[in-house]
A protein has these predicted regions:
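Acidic, metal-coordinating catalytic segment for phosphate/diphosphate chemistry
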Residues: 1-43
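Conserved Nudix-box catalytic region and its N-terminal flanking loop in Nudix hydrolases
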Residues: 23-35, 44-88, 158
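Short, well-ordered beta-strand micro-motif
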Residues: 38-40, 52, 123-125
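Nudix hydrolase/Nudix homology domain
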Residues: 68, 102-109, 113-212
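A short coil-to-beta-strand element that immediately follows conserved catalytic motifs
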Residues: 92-102
Length: 212
């Protein structure tokens, strides 16, 4: 099976070629990804939906991460990334329903990997019950609603841990409801500016909706 091929870019964002995914990560080349954050507002409090990454993932296994995300393959456009919502979550959404935030650059370093992403980032407000999601077991092992105010306090170092509520898949693939204690180290270490831009955008959208 041929390895995924990704478009690569220079520091200025100009397309410079195509490279295999493993080489892109090994060499630290800029490439495009699709990110979609699902959120909801409950009793005037914003909650964001995080996925728990599969323990066999090559980057940041077992950590809490963006609701749905994936690489854009060579020649693909941001609209093609909407497939990730269907594949990872079983959620059928049109690209036009997503709220675009633009491109946010994000650099993460892990053992043997330099991940330099140009993230086409989107928001989607959705209050679908967690039990109605059909997650991709090879990629995701659970989903958790996370309080945004508490998460900001956690990332700022004001609290050491917080409780997140959701489900984990059991060994036979059945979802089991769970309240889990999470520390900052349990979240994928996206750059501070990345999280700040996403959180600020969610708060603006929620405030605008409340004022309508």
């Amino acid at each position: 099976m041929q390895e995924e091929q990704l478009d690569i870019f220079d520091e200025a964002g100009q397309h410079i070629g195509v490279e295999a995914r493993s080489e892109v990560h090994r060499l630290g080349l800029w490439h495009q990804t699709f990110h979609c954050w699902i959120y909801r507002v409950v009793d005037d409090q914003i909650e964001m939906l995080f996925q728990k990454r599969h323990p066999q993932k090559d980057t940041f296994p077992d950590l809490l991460d963006i609701t749905s995300a994936g690489h854009l393959l060579a020649a693909e456009q941001p609209c093609d990334g909407v497939r990730e919502l269907e594949e990872e979550l079983g959620l059928s959404v049109s690209f036009e329903e997503l709220d675009p935030l633009g491109v946010i650059r994000d650099v993460m370093v892990a053992p043997s990997i330099i991940d330099k992403e140009m993230c086409h980032t989107f928001l989607y407000e959705c209050d679908q019950p967690l039990g109605e999601y059909r997650i991709q077991e090879e990629e995701v092992t659970g989903l958790f609603w996370v309080s945004l105010p508490e998460l900001e306090r956690l990332f700022a170092g004001e609290i050491g841990q917080m409780t997140v509520n959701g489900f984990l898949l059991t060994e036979n693939g059945e979802p089991k409801d769970i309240a889990m204690i999470a520390a900052k180290a349990d979240f994928v270490p996206h750059e501070v500016h990345y999280y700040q831009q996403v959180f600020a955008a969610v708060k603006r959208r929620a405030a605008n909706a409340a004022n309508r």
